[in-house]
Amino acid sequence: MVIYYKNGDEFYNDNREIIDNNLIENSFFKLNYPAIMGFERKNFCIKIIDNEKYLIALNRDPYNLLLFGDVSLCDKLAYEIYSHNLHINGVLASEDLVNEFCKSYTKYSKFKFDDLFSMGLLVSNEVSDENDAQKASIEDIKLLQDYDKKFHIEIFNEEPKIDHEIIADNYYVYKFNNEIVSCAHKTREEENICSISGVYTNPNYRGKGFARKVVSTIRNEIVKSGKIAYLYVDNNNPISSHLYKSIGFKLLVNRKEVKCIESNIKRVVFAGGCFWCIAGAFYNLDGVLEVYSGYSGGKKVNPSYNEVKSGTTGHMEAIMIEYDSDKITYENLLKTYFENIDPFDGDGQFIDRGSSYQTAVFTNNENQKIIFENIINDIQNKYNKEVKVKLLDENIFNFAEEEHQKFAIKHPDKYKHEEEISGRTKFNKINI
C-alpha cells in the first residue's frame, strides 16, 4: 500500500510514533514536515506499507530526500517517485537505505548519484569538566555569519542555499586573545534531544583542542538540562571522530548523503490531446528512450482514465518522454510535438473535446521556456493565428493504466484507425 500525504501535518500525525520514538535519527523529518503544504513535485511525503513493514519518505526542496524504515521497500518507493516524475536533489538516510534506494532508482530512471558524505551519528549523555567556551554575544554575530558560510563551503563545497539566521544565544565560542577561534551552535532542539552543529575552527588555530572545548561546553549544557546531545561527524575524518568519541560521544548509526548528478538523460512532459496518438509520434525518434502515457496538470494522485475524461480532476492526458540529450535536443522534441497537434485549438484536439484533451507544455526550465516562446512566435507569424498551447510549470505525472501504455506499438491497426477517425491524418500539419 502507498500513502500520498496531502501535507506535512497529515504525514506527521500519521507517523508521530515512528518519528518521535526514533527522534535522533528522524530529527530532520521533525524539522521539515511543517513546510510541506501539499503533495507537489518537489515537496512531498510518502509512506510504503507491506504488512508490518514500512518506509517513510519526505522531500523538501532544496534539501535531500529523507528516508526511514525497511530497506526491502526501497524499490517500491523508487518506482513511485520515478513514475510520478517527482524531483529529488539527493538522499540522506542510513547507509543501507541510501544504497538500496539509489540502486533501485537508477534502475528505473537511468539517473546517477554522487556520494557526498559518509557520516557517523554520535550521541552523548555524559558530562565532562570542560566548560571553557562561552555563549556568543550580539557583537559576535557578524563574524559568526562569516564562519557559518565558511563552514558550509568547506563541508559542502558550495555556499549555503539559504542564509541561516544567527541567534547569538544558541552559539558558543572559544576566544583566544579576544578573537573567536572556534564556534558551534545548538540546533533542532526537542523535548529530550538537542543537536550540535556548525563546528568550525579558524584554520590558523586548528589542532589546538579549541573545537573540543566548544563542543564539550555545549554538550554539558544540553545533558544538564536533561536531554541527549547528538552530532554528525564525517567518517572520512578520523581526527574529528576520535575527538568526539574521546569526550564521551558514541556511534548510534552510520548515515550517508548523496546528490543527483546532472546527466544527459532528461524528461519532458507534453499534453497533446489523446495520448495514444501523440505518443506514437515519438517512439521511433533516435535518442528517445521511453514514452509513457499518463495524466498531468491536476491535484489528485493516480486518477483513473474515466475520472480524467470526466473533466473533474483538472488533469490532461499527457506523455512523459525520457530522452538522451546527447542524441536529440529539447527543441527537436518540441518541434515534433507541434507538428503533431493543432496548436490553434484551445478546447481539445480534433475529435477529442474537453479540458482533458487540451494542449500544454510543462517546464520550469528557463532555457526551455525561451525555446517554447520562440517556436510560438514563429508559428503565429507564419500562420497569422493565435497559438493556444499552454505553458505550465512542471507538475506531478501519473502513469496511466497499463492498457494505455505503448498503444501504437501494441495495437498498430487500432492506432491507425484511431488516427483516422480522430481527424489527425486529414489535418494539414504545420511546418516549423
List the predicted regions and their residue ranges.
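Short amphipathic alpha-helix that is part of the acyltransferase structural core
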Residues: 1-28, 123-157, 404
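Conserved donor-binding loop and adjoining core beta-sheet/short helix segment
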Residues: 3, 23, 30-84, 184-194
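A conserved beta-strand-loop-helix scaffold within acyl/acetyltransferase catalytic domains
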Residues: 60-61, 161-200
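Acyl-donor-binding surface of acyltransferase catalytic domains
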Residues: 60-130
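Conserved acetyl-CoA-binding loop-helix of GNAT-fold acetyltransferases
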Residues: 72-79, 201, 207-221, 242, ...
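Conserved beta-strand-loop-alpha-helix junction that forms the acyl-donor binding cleft
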Residues: 92-98, 230-241, 257-262
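Conserved active-site alpha-helix within GNAT-family acetyltransferase domains
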Residues: 97-111, 212, 236-253
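Flexible coil/turn and secondary-structure edge motifs
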Residues: 263-432
